[in-house]
Amino acid sequence: MLNPHGGKLINKIATEEERKDLTEKAKTLKKIVIADRYVSDCEMIANGGFSPLDGFMTKEDAESVINDIQLKNGLLWAIPIVLPVGEDVFNQIKIGDEVALYDRHNRPIAIMVVEDKYTLDLENYCKNVFKTTDIEHPGVKVVKSAGNKFIGGEIIRLLNRPVREGIDEKYYLDPAQVRENIKNKGWKKIVAFQTRNPIHRAHEYIIKVALEPMDGVMIHPLVGETKPDDIPADVRMKCYEVLIDNYFNREKVHLSVLPASMHYAGPREAIHHMLMRKNYGATHMIIGRDHAGVGDYYGTYEAQEFVEQFVDQLEIQPLKFEHSFYCTKCENMASFKTCPHPKEDHIHLSGTKVRAMLREGKRPPKEFSRPEVADILIKWATGKNG
């Protein structure tokens, strides 16, 4: 197993005793209500998923990441982990203050020391991180709508986890717990699979091919904030469960969730996803076509080419896969490397196509989804899952 990024797994989660004392303390501090995606960031900082980060970035770190894809100390990092605040809050806060971060349910999430307050050039941020300044890009929209005032500093302790809706708590495992699980299984080579969609037949094929030379696979769906038209996390989890139970060797699969949010930053986010999975104990990660992409903002294999530039610093190794499809002649999943038949015989699968079918109330065919998965999706899409 690889060491965590930067060498040490961060842990900022309050013990039960600390939690009681700090919850009382939070009532005496300046209160800042933060959006769900920053609540997710608090958890990822505190549980070690964002190691070596121990808080929200200062201006120096944020600009270094935006411009040079590294922290100010030279360590590889691809996505700015920053905390935007409103102008009133920004003006009231002084460097050195302790503040209490609250979620929209009025729960204290974390106590933070303000080490920096600053502005950023948002056009430069978006151009470098997302390769576009187009407000229609979901990541750009988040950045630009959040404003240009930021505070940075260490998270002292995480007091409460984000509100979970519909997902069994057993799947919320912190990096230290996943690492322990992997160690107990005796796995040395672990491939991670990132997903924000139900696993269709093309995904299943790629995971199984990737698993062949490995000891185990970490199916690690992202359950933080995604696009409004993405399928909800609780529905996706049911799909993963039935797929693993019916079509995988259960002994070779680890299923848990990643409580991070999507940025849709394509090539840069591929690095971000790899570093998080390295912290969770993976040695390899599947990077497929248009990884963490959206629309037509990135090239099909741009993320794969991009991560190749950083393999020495990443340490976790990318497993790169071309597009796979169902071939009606082969009567099986295949890729251009393995299938001799013309394109007319290929049924190309994607999460986008599955979502479009579901919006129209159509059941995904067996070439797209396993029947058990299709049952769950069509029930959800037609409102019969209540």
Curated annotation (Swiss-Prot):
Pathway noted in the entry: Sulfur metabolism; hydrogen sulfide biosynthesis; sulfite from sulfate: step 1/3
EC number, as in UniProt: 2.7.7.4
Keyword annotations: ATP-binding, Nucleotide-binding, Nucleotidyltransferase, Transferase
Any one Gene Ontology molecular-function term assigned to this protein's record: sulfate adenylyltransferase (ATP) activity
A GO BP annotation: sulfate assimilation
Catalysed conversion reaction: sulfate + ATP + H(+) = adenosine 5'-phosphosulfate + diphosphate
Superkingdom of the source species: Bacteria
Class of the enzyme per the UniProt entry, highest EC level: transferase
Keyword Calcium attributed: no
CDD domains according to UniProt: ATPS
SUPFAM superfamilies: Nucleotidylyl transferase, PUA domain-like
HAMAP family the UniProt entry points to: Sulf_adenylyltr
Family: Belongs to the sulfate adenylyltransferase family.
Protein name, as recorded: Sulfate adenylyltransferase
The organism of origin for this protein: Persephonella marina (strain DSM 14350 / EX-H1)
Name of encoding gene: sat
